[in-house]
């Protein structure tokens, strides 16, 4: 149904009357701070489209500042979907839930002859809309509550126990997952329990479908128009630091205090706070944890130090997240292997003073080309796929007593400071052991005539053998 809706041919405006067009699914990628929401709003206004947010934190009610939601005024200018509809206390909302709801919305937007514009920073949410990459363990009409609850139950068990169980039913998937990655291990076990088919077998079937590839199944929509906003890293870092300052000026601390008081204070008092699930994963909340729980209980100087520490941590983690987002785009979009991979068009956003000519106008031209069925004049960005770099191999470092998943991660580990320190320590211990053996083997009075019984030279030979 999605492909049919996406390929719906509708009459164009009066300037091109008589022609036919195929409405595209517009997707805007980019790291945080590149202006994705701004471009989506502008395209939505110009093209009469509707915006579908693809942000795993913006689905929750609350924390509007820290999750950088569009304002109520902006939502009135252009209709937005998938924002602020999940209760903040819900901790088991998944990408499957997002995919099911957002796909239905996109089909509805197409059915009303409008252009859906998908925008957000959660790239695997966007992947779930573009490609067949997820596994349905239950019929959609039955809902996902029971399935999700089973995954939650599994996550309560010990990670090593879960991983051992997975290695018995799906050794191929177990070899790709770290025992500490409990959520993914639990998900793979859930797939097997609910279907009787291993997770890896499901993925193999997707990859071998017509249009599928090494990273997933075929495209779900026939005419995706993908735009990638990118900027010089130094410029983006500076912009992100300013964004944090702007958030603080907009009332970030008050928002965090209120949210902590309403939703998290009881958990902290019971030492059961969880920054791994739900909205509590949001960048910014855990960075101010110490400040929030000690505010009013310590000296002003200590409180100010914790506040400063939280602000600096927020700036650093935001910049790291931006780099992670760009790596994901390069690995999963720009260098994606497979027979049918949609083009990705890059838009340079380093100089915001040139936004109109460098970003908005080229974006409109690209989208209009898709609408009219023409190939854009802009050249898409394509990077070579490095199969070895993406290989999720299992490595065990006996020296550090660590499991490393991934060839790239393994290469980084053996060059890491911690591994090299362990290597030096091992060599030092080995050297000390050799010296000890040598000192024990050589008698203090070795220059004297041996008095032990035995044939001549026997003891000398034993000494030589032991050194």
Swiss-Prot record:
Any Gene Ontology biological process: mitochondrial tRNA modification
UniProt: dimethylallyl diphosphate binding residues: 32-37
Primary gene name: TRIT1
Ranges annotated as Matrin-type zinc finger: 395-425
Enzymatic reactions: adenosine(37) in tRNA + dimethylallyl diphosphate = N(6)-dimethylallyladenosine(37) in tRNA + diphosphate
Keywords, ordered alphabetically: ATP-binding, Cytoplasm, Disease variant, Metal-binding, Mitochondrion, Nucleotide-binding, Phosphoprotein, Primary mitochondrial disease, Transferase, Transit peptide, tRNA processing, Zinc, Zinc-finger
Record carries keyword Transcription regulation: no
Transit peptide per record: 1-47
UniProt-annotated stretches for the region Interaction with isopentenylpyrophosphate transferase: 233-255
Disease: Combined oxidative phosphorylation deficiency 35: An autosomal recessive disorder caused by defective mitochondrial metabolism and deficiencies of mitochondrial respiratory enzyme complexes. Clinical manifestations include global developmental delay, intellectual disability, microcephaly, and early-onset seizures.
Impact reported for residue 286 to E: In COXPD35; uncertain significance
Upper lineage: Eukaryota, Metazoa, Chordata, Craniata, Vertebrata
Biased composition (Polar residues): 433-444
UniProt cross-references to SMART domains, sorted A to Z: ZnF_U1
Phosphoserine: residues bearing it: 443, 455
Protein name: tRNA dimethylallyltransferase
NCBIfam families listed in its UniProt record: miaA (TIGR00174)
UniProt cross-references to SUPFAM superfamilies, sorted A to Z: beta-beta-alpha zinc fingers, P-loop containing nucleoside triphosphate hydrolases
Organism: Homo sapiens
Gene Ontology cellular-component terms listed: mitochondrial matrix; mitochondrion
Interaction with substrate tRNA as annotated region, ranges: 55-58, 183-187, 281-283, 313-331
Region (Core aggregation region): 221-230
Zinc as UniProt keyword: yes
């Amino acid at each position: 149904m999605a492909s049919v809706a996406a390929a719906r041919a509708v009459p164009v405006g009066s300037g091109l009357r008589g022609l036919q067009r195929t409405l595209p699914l517009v997707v805007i990628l980019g790291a945080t701070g590149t202006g994705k929401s701004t471009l989506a709003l502008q395209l939505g206004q110009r093209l009469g489209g509707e915006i579908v947010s693809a942000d795993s934190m913006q689905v929750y009610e609350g924390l509007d500042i820290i999750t950088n939601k569009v304002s109520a005024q902006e939502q009135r200018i252009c209709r937005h979907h998938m924002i602020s509809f999940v209760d903040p206390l819900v901790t088991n909302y998944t990408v499957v839930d997002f995919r099911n709801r957002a796909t239905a919305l996109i089909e509805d937007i197409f059915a009303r002859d409008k252009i859906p514009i998908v925008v957000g920073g959660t790239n695997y949410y966007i992947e779930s809309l573009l490609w067949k990459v997820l596994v349905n363990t239950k019929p959609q009409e039955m809902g996902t509550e029971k399935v999700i609850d089973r995954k939650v139950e599994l996550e309560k068990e010990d990670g090593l126990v879960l991983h051992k169980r997975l290695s018995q039913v799906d050794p191929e998937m177990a070899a790709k997952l770290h025992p500490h990655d409990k959520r993914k291990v639990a998900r793979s076990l859930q797939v097997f329990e609910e279907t009787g088919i291993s997770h890896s077998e499901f993925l193999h079937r997707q990859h071998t479908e017509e249009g599928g590839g090494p990273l997933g199944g075929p495209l779900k929509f026939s005419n995706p128009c993908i735009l990638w906003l990118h900027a010089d890293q130094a410029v983006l870092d500076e912009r992100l630091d300013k964004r944090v300052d702007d958030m603080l000026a907009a009332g970030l601390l008050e928002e965090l205090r209120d949210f902590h008081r309403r939703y998290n204070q009881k958990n902290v008092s019971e030492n059961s706070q969880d920054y791994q699930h739900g909205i509590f994963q949001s960048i910014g909340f855990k960075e101010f944890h110490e400040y929030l729980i000690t505010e009013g209980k310590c000296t002003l100087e200590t409180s100010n130090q914790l506040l400063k520490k939280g602000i600096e941590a927020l700036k650093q983690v935001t910049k790291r997240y931006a780099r992670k987002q760009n790596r994901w785009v390069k690995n999963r979009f720009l260098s994606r292997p497979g027979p049918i991979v949609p083009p990705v068009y890059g838009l340079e956003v380093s100089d915001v003073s040139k936004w109109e000519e460098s970003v908005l106008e080229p974006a409109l031209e690209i989208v209009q080309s898709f609408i009219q069925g023409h190939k854009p004049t802009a050249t898409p960005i394509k990077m070579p796929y490095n199969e070895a770099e993406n290989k999720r191999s299992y490595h065990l470092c006996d020296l550090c007593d660590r499991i490393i998943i991934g060839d790239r991660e393994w290469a980084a580990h053996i060059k890491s400071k911690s591994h090299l320190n362990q290597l030096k320590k091992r060599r030092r211990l080995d050297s000390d052991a050799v010296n000890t053996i040598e000192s024990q083997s050589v008698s203090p009075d070795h220059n004297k005539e041996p008095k032990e019984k035995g044939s001549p030279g026997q003891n000398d030979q034993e000494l030589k053998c032991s050194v």
